[in-house]
Swiss-Prot record:
Gene: bcat-1
Listed GO biological process terms: determination of adult lifespan; embryo development ending in birth or egg hatching; isoleucine catabolic process; L-leucine biosynthetic process; L-leucine catabolic process; L-valine biosynthetic process; nematode larval development; valine catabolic process
A GO MF term: L-isoleucine-2-oxoglutarate transaminase activity
Protein name per UniProt: Branched-chain-amino-acid aminotransferase, cytosolic
E.C. number: 2.6.1.42
Lineage: Eukaryota, Metazoa, Ecdysozoa, Nematoda, Chromadorea
Protein location: Cytoplasm
Family to which the UniProt record says this protein belongs: Belongs to the class-IV pyridoxal-phosphate-dependent aminotransferase family.
């Protein structure tokens, strides 16, 4: 059976099988029967097809001397991953190349109809100097669900994780040697076909950029104040609040400015006549209290209504809380009236957000707009003075897992 030949350019590497092979003037061969048997580019791109263009000396950037002082999202590493898709051919070969600008037509779907989704994940340099990703399978599963909802192309999670691993190997010097810093990864999928009119994208681009990020709390935990006003809604049943799409974030910016004008750092998103709690800022929300039955309980809103992004950190905290067995762990709807009642009865001990950026974020105050009186009420949350230390234990444990001080089976992926 004849072989299919593929030539790659000088200073480019091609992945066939499991490792890099130099290809300055080299032909790689893959048996045609293997292609027919295993390749289906309508379904996914493949790690084995990965092409890597190495950066020249002038393209490599100076790394920050003190990563703890980095501002989130302002510094990028040397490389990025890209992979194109079109409806006729399916996925093209994935590529890793020096980071640079994308060329996109002004009529691209993403620019007009927000045909887009993204993920946020991190890689950590452990105390043993090994680099690991935190639960990447969960990020990829969520990204695939979002792609389906956005009518963008599907892909295989393991193929994507393997490509991310190669990207991290090239950018490994950008992973800070610090137990409070990390390398942030932003996988993104956009519709790119240059046609106006609402409809399914016939062309798309996957890309991944990375960058080092400092400690979220450089001087220790800083409790945040929340604006809670049910006149502003983040998500609704049947919508896309449970998916990581850019269209969920842009409409929240103005509300965030309103919160800042009232000396609040985040928004506590409420929903419905009962003012159900959903999210805090871009984080999931947790409460630790004594419930009305007298049980100590960790509680967070449920996912079933589609109002809440299923956070990786959220899932991790729930799993740890249930493993510890020190209190009841519950996912159920809760509303502002319950919060106010628990505060008045002094049985609400801690409230905190959870997310990739910070692990946990303590809440110190809620500025609540009372829709009956049309006045604002200040509700003080005793998170920082809590004797139970539930939030702190979560932070310490997740941090220890991420940096390799604690081994948690299946949670960290070595690169």
């Amino acid at each position: 059976m004849p072989a299919i030949l593929s030539r790659v350019a000088p200073r480019t590497f091609n992945l066939v099988g499991s490792r890099l092979m130099a290809s300055a003037a080299r032909l790689e061969t893959v048996p045609r029967e293997e292609i027919h048997k295993e390749y289906d580019r309508k379904k996914t791109f493949y790690h084995r097809d990965l092409e890597i263009q190495l950066a020249g000396p002038t393209q490599l950037k100076t790394k920050p001397l003190d990563p703890t002082k980095l501002k989130f999202g302002h510094t990028y590493a040397d490389y990025m991953m890209t992979c194109d898709w079109d409806a006729e051919r399916g996925w093209h070969h994935p590529k890793i190349e020096p980071i640079g600008e994308l060329k996109i037509h002004p009529g691209a779907k993403v620019l007009h109809y927000a045909s887009e989704l993204f993920e946020g994940m991190k890689a950590y340099r452990g105390i043993d100097n090994k680099i690991r990703m935190f639960r990447p399978e969960m990020n990829m599963a969520r990204m695939k669900r979002t792609a389906l909802r956005a009518a963008l192309p599907d892909f295989d999670s393991e193929e994507m994780i393997n490509v991310l691993t190669e990207l991290l190997r090239l950018d490994q010097e950008w992973v800070p040697n610090s137990d409070v810093c990390s390398l942030y990864l932003r996988p993104t999928l956009i519709g790119t076909d240059p046609t106006l009119g609402v409809g399914c994208a016939t062309e798309a681009k996957m890309f991944v950029i990375t960058g080092p990020v400092g400690a979220y709390y450089s001087t220790g935990f800083q409790p945040v104040s929340l604006l809670a006003d049910s006149r502003f809604i983040r998500a609704f049943p049947g919508g896309v609040g449970a998916y990581k799409m850019g269209c969920n974030y842009a409409p929240t910016i103005w509300v965030g400015k309103e919160a800042a004008s009232k000396n609040c750092q985040q928004v506590l998103w409420l929903y419905g006549e009962n003012e159900d709690l959903t999210e805090v800022g871009t984080m999931n929300i947790f409460l630790f209290w004594k419930n009305e039955e007298g049980d100590m309980e960790l509680i967070t809103p449920p996912l079933h209504r589609g109002l809440i992004l299923p956070g990786v950190t959220r899932d991790s905290l729930l799993e740890l809380g249930r493993e510890w067995g020190e209190y009841k762990v519950t996912e159920r709807t809760l509303n502002m009236e319950e919060v106010k009642k628990a505060l008045s009865e002094k049985r609400l001990y801690e409230m905190f957000g959870s997310g990739t950026a910070c692990v946990v974020s303590p809440v110190g105050k809620i500025l609540y707009h009372n829709k009956v009186t049309d006045e604002y009420e200040e509700l003080h949350i005793p998170t920082m003075s809590s004797k139970f230390g539930v939030m702190q234990k979560f932070y310490n444990t997740i941090n220890d897992i991420q940096y390799g001080r604690i081994i948690k089976d299946g949670w960290m992926r070595d690169i």
